[in-house]
Amino acid sequence: FFPLRTRALALPPDVRVMICHSCVRAPKSEAAMQEYNRRPIECRLAAALIAAELRRRCAFPAAVERLADVDRSRIPLPAAEIDRIIASALTPAAQTLAQLAQKLGRSEASLLETELSPSPRFRLQPPADGFQVQRRYRHVVGEAERVEKATRALESGDAAALGRLMDASHASCRDDYGISTPELDELVALGREAGSLGSRLTGAGFGGCTVHLVPAEQVKVFKERVWRSYYRTYLPGRRPDLATGDDPDKVMFETGAAAGAGFIDLIE
């Protein structure tokens, strides 16, 4: 995203994308804002920890504000040494604010005023379970690798490979980025059982929708199975407070690749 780059890639013609709503609302205000903003802040903290370790090891001069700034091509060290530095900077255990301050050579107050306060209206409260910097780093780097692999899968028309990458992406969103919910996980699992090639949550998580890559000839069966297993069985049994109504088209719809925004000159 820095800078933003785009590239046109075609979906295989024999697959469709099914969008299924989990029926869990994902608010973007008040307490939920802490969770939404926590992840990018933890990513910036991970970048700062890596940069600090690089400066100690090789006098790395470049400014680092985000994980994308930790460009291996700019680091004058062998790949294995870079891996060791990152492993040293990002320990598996969650970090407290005091531990982060010590590693970065900063005061806790300084971190609260800067990294934990990305805007005048928001300050992240130190999470009770600690800052999960290694897990967030692993997710972001893994997603970047999956994007590159997805590009190659689309170029070769390999829908099955694309589906496997979607599955891996959801697992990372769940386990490392921590933005899934039991309902999203269930909907993804049931989507796979119903015939999708790959399924994942979409958007910022904590509710909302899932996307499923479905063979075109399987769309009708997929929709019937997911309607029955998730909307008519799982939700009434586990979350009866989430009303779905009686119309599958209100919570599931089929889509596919189409031409994007463009300019049409109507004057000859």
Q: What role is predicted for each listed range?
A:
Residues 1-198, 212-268:
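C-terminal nucleotide
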Residues 199-209:
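Conserved phosphate/anionic-ligand binding catalytic regions in large, soluble enzymes, centered on
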